[in-house]
């Protein structure tokens, strides 16, 4: 939770420790189904060749599935707890709910007491590199628009579309499974160009142009220098 995050930050300061958190996709791995690492995208954005502001669309069309199979089931029927499961320990600080096999094991993400479905589970992995690409690590959206059915208090449901808008006009658009805009949706879109899945770009000779530009600063140097 936000409160727990604040307490972690306070403990780090109080004990004069080093702490860093983001995802590995800033560094080198291919960014899920996008078909490229983050580095050339960062070079392209920082070059200004796409213009500004930018819109980033995270959807199945651009290579990112939201795992809607991680939704919960309403009105679960209580079941006998398996003899090899300490259900009380599994619940931990979460409020007690009668055991049902769908509440634990591989499908626990579909219940608000333990997770938030594919959006909160995969969102950190999908959106952290985008914050980095857009240079938004030190800021937050000024407006969030959500198109989703009313959610059940226990079981996580689906959603259709979420739009984050920043004060400079940049947007991050999340499109839920089955609600994609369709067609050949660009992953990154600016007033001067577009980038699609597989690093297809509307800017001519983009790879040659990027080869002449400096690489972005490594993302792990600050931690190593602190150590």
Task: Explain the meaning of each model-derived region.
Residues 80, 88-168, 213:
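Rossmann-like dinucleotide-binding domain that binds NAD(P)(H)
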Residues 18, 155, 225-227:
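C-terminal helix-rich "cap/oligomerization" subdomain common to oxidoreductases
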Residues 1-7, 21, 126, 174, ...:
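Extended, hydrophobic alpha-helical segments in both membrane/secreted and soluble proteins
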Residues 2-88:
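A contiguous active-site-proximal alpha/beta segment in oxidoreductase catalytic domains
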Residues 165-171, 192-193:
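Glycine-centered tight beta-turn/hairpin loop motif at sheet-sheet or coil-to-beta transitions
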Residues 59-65, 94, 148-151, 178-179:
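Glycine-rich beta-alpha junction loops
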Residues 98-101, 115-135, 159-161, 181-227:
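C-terminal helical cap and adjacent loop that interface with cofactors, partners, or active-site loops
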Residues 9, 41-45, 87, 91, ...:
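Non-transmembrane alpha-helical segments in soluble domains
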């Amino acid at each position: 939770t936000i409160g727990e995050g604040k307490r972690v930050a306070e403990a780090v300061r109080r004990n004069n420790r080093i702490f860093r958190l983001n995802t590995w996709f800033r560094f080198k791995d291919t960014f899920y189904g996008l078909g490229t690492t983050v580095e050339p995208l960062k070079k392209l954005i920082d070059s200004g060749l796409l213009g500004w502001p930018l819109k980033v669309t995270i959807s199945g069309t651009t290579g990112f599935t939201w795992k809607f199979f991680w939704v919960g089931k309403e009105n679960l029927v209580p079941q006998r707890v398996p003899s090899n499961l300490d259900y009380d320990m599994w619940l931990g600080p979460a409020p007690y709910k009668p055991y049902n096999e769908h509440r634990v094991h591989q499908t626990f993400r579909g219940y608000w007491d333990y997770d938030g479905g594919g959006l909160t589970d995969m969102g950190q992995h999908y959106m952290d590199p985008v914050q980095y690409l857009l240079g938004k690590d030190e800021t937050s959206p000024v407006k969030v628009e959500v198109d989703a059915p009313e959610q059940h208090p226990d079981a996580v449901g689906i959603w259709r579309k979420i739009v984050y808008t920043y004060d400079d006009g940049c947007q991050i658009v999340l499109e839920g499974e089955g609600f994609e805009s369709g067609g050949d949706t660009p992953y990154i879109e600016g007033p001067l160009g577009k980038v699609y899945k597989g690093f297809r770009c509307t800017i001519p000779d983009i790879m040659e142009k990027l080869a002449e530009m400096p690489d972005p600063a490594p993302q792990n140097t600050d931690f190593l220098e602190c150590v």
